[in-house]
Amino acid sequence: TKDVDVEKVRALAPDLVLANQEENARPAIESLIAAGVPVHVSFPRTVPEALAYLGSLATLLGVEEPAIARRAFARHAVIERTPRRVFVPIWRDPWMTFDENAFASDLLALVGAQNVFADRPRRYPLAADLGKRAAMTGARVAGRDTRYPRIQLQEVVERAPDLVLLPDEPYAFGPADRDVLAELLPEAEVRLTDGKDLFWYGARLATSIDALAEAVDRRSRPA
């Protein structure tokens, strides 16, 4: 949960708290640390950073680092592929996606997919993100998160993806959304996919790498 009840956590006297810089509120994490609670904060933006996180977590827990994720990374990193141009929305109303600085973008690149919005940062304010006014610049946007642009469907058409992956989280895309995008992009393959394969960077990373590689592979098109 983003909003941690600090007092309830302290009452549990945990040996270790696993937190994420993006998912958990900073004041709560700082309060736990100030109270002497051991906190391990993660924020991987690339697959190598996720692998490093798994290694550091194994060290903290006093267990052997699982090698399966590193093997999956090494196996796919050496495969030469012609990249597929992929669009992955993460929200609707407004439509949102991610740029090259998000973990999912690096994961997709590993398995042979080029994020068509890699070079499209989020612009402020909302009207600028939607192309209705000039974007704020300089100190006015310093420190703001620009990884998740809000986009219009016309932008998707213009960037011409040949593959669309519709995850079931954080927004639960379904068959109706698939139909909308299939009509919008008649030349593209549109697939529903498990959001955990795109956005979860923990112990399931090896499974995610292989599952995404199969989703991106042209030879694995559903009948």
What are these regions (language model features)?
Residues 61, 216-220:
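Short, hydrophobic alpha-helical segments
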Residues 54-62:
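Helix-loop "lid/cap" segments that line or gate small-molecule binding pockets
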Residues 1-48, 67-206, 222-223:
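Binding-cleft/active-site segments that stabilize strongly anionic ligands or cofactors
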